[in-house]
């Protein structure tokens, strides 16, 4: 799935080898800001040790649980085939089907125009339904057809392998939405953006879910893991254990991640939300807030987390861009703070990271940066006070 600051490339540039080395001595692996879960999956598929995946957002927990909480492949395609057939029946019988047909007929086979997008928004706003995405995102991130497909798939989620099915749908939606970068705002129907909306709206959600479920089904963990939807600080203080290897990849944006992934969070929660603004955001109180994504509190949050870690017999691996980021943090700052409490080994790697959807004129969507990998160990002769 698309995810801001994914460690997929960094795993191939030294992080993976480092984790292999450190996991030999660790009792568990704890991924404190798991995001898309790529690091949790990397460890879970290679070591006979428990992986704990922690994140503030529910969609992250669902994605991680689909992989790390299962120790066998899902054989055959009966589950996903039965689910999609049930969703298609629901789609065919829903009253919104006629609205989708009305919109499709008005567009025809011609290329998409601004009036087509505005008509889609009008239709999805006018006809209130009990679906999760129809009124909130139809005509914006999703076409009317796609919004109805998502709602039908949510309504018909099977009880067996429900988490894996929901994870497949979240993954598909992340690759379907008509938005630059990471769904902070949908494309507006301008002349330049219309081709991107048209391309996104042509994607079939049913086909995408089938593809993504099969990808999830063939992967699993060696040992059944655990997911925690909650705050990293609270987990460290209350659930971290001596002997854990802790992976820390905190937010680097001064904008809350819940603003970029609210569409995925809505799908994960499977509940209707009232949205507003160009980004179609839920209310502020409904979006998880992290002190690490607030420029005024990020440094304090890092310091507090490091102090809590220093009270446990653990090894921590921290990754962060070397340069100053919009939340006021940098790899250098984190390293300097960590050296007050730990012996720190520093590794530098060139990597690219998302700028949250660049426009290629002011900035590219992805930029090269130097990423620091910091290994934190307790200082020799240090007395750990719990």
Q: For the regions a protein language model found, what residue spans apply to each?
A:
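S-adenosyl-L-methionine
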Residues: 1-28, 38-45, 63
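Conserved glycine-rich SAM-binding loop
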Residues: 6, 35, 251-253
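SAM-dependent nucleic-acid methyltransferase catalytic core
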Residues: 11-13, 121-247, 251-260, 275-278, ...
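Conserved acidic residues
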Residues: 27, 244-245, 314
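SAM cofactor-binding core of SAM-dependent methyltransferases
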Residues: 27-92, 96, 137-139, 147-155, ...
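SAM-dependent methyltransferase catalytic-core segment centered on the flexible catalytic loop
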Residues: 253-312
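Conserved Class I SAM-dependent methyltransferase catalytic core
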Residues: 289-347
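Class I S-adenosyl-L-methionine
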Residues: 331-335, 342-386
